[in-house]
Amino acid sequence: MSSPSSLDFYDAELRAHHEHLRAAYGIGPGDEVLDIGCGTGLTTREAARGAAPGRVVGVDVSQRMLERARQLTAAEGLGNVRYELGDAQVHRFEPASFDVAISRFGTMFFSDPNAAFANIAGALRPEGRLVLLVWQRLEHNHWVQAIDAALGDAAQSPPPGADPFSLGDAQATARILERAGFDAPRFQDVHEPVLYGHDLDAALAIVRGFQSTSAALANLNDDEAAGAVERLRSTLAGHDTNERGVALDSRSWLITATRRRDDA
C-alpha cells in the first residue's frame, strides 16, 4: 500500500482515538513540540497550528511516510514544521529543547524501550510533557484477534521488535517511563473502534493490503487463500455498522507524564 490515499487511510482508521489525544495535547503558542513516529504528519501539522510561532519536529523511520507528510504540510502552508528521518531511540535530538513530546501509536516498536524513552526524556526540558497513545494488551484488541482468527494457522506473530502491544501492560510501562526520567505517569483507558472503511468491500481491500495479511495469504495455496479471504469477508461483515462503516473494537492507553526536574 503506497498511494497517497492508502497512506492517509491510517489517519481515518484512528480518527476516534485521535480526538482523545488532541484533547490531552495542551499545546500553546510558542511551544516547541516533538512528534515521535509522526507518519504522514497529521498530528505534526495539528501541533504546528497550535504551537505557532513555536516549531514542531516530526520524526519517523519511514521515508515514504515523511515524503507524504512534507507534501501535506507544504499544501497547508505551514512554515514551522521540520521532518527528520530517524529512530527516536537513537536519534540525536538537541538536549532539553522541547516543551512537549507527543506520539499517536508511534512508540511501541523500539528495540530497547528503556533507552528510547531516556533519549526522548533528554530531548525535553525539565517539566516538559509527554503525551502518548499506545495499544493495550492484545486480549483487549478485537480488531487484531478477529483478523487472526479468520486467517487461522496462517496468521503470523510479529517479528521481534515489531509488537504493537509491547507497551500494553500499564504497570510495566510506568516503570519504563519512571526509569527514563519521567514523573507521575498516568494511564487513561481509551475504548474506541478501529474504523476499517466505509463499506464491506473497502474494508476487505484495506485488511488484505496489510503486510501481515498479505504475507499470511501468500503462505497458502489458492483454495486455502480463497477460504481465508471469505472468512475475512464474513468477519468484517459482522462488524459493518452502516453509519460508520466497518468498525472493530479496540482499547488503548492515553499516557501522560512529566519530565523530571534535574534537581529532583
Predicted regions, residues:
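C-terminal helical/coil "lid" or tail adjacent to the Rossmann-like core of SAM-dependent
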Residues: 1-9, 184-244
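A short SAM/SAH-binding and catalytic strip from SAM-dependent methyltransferases
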Residues: 99-114, 136
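Class I SAM-dependent methyltransferase SAM/SAH-binding core
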Residues: 32-36, 40-91, 115
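Conserved catalytic/acceptor-binding region of the Class I
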Residues: 114-115, 125, 129-198, 214-219
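Conserved class I S-adenosyl-L-methionine
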Residues: 1-31, 42-46, 50, 65-68, ...
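Core SAM-dependent methyltransferase catalytic element
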Residues: 180, 204-205, 252-264
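Helix-to-beta-strand junctions that scaffold the AdoMet/dcAdoMet cofactor pocket
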Residues: 51, 110-111, 124-126
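A short acidic, Gly/Pro-enriched loop at the edge of an enzyme's catalytic core
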Residues: 89-100
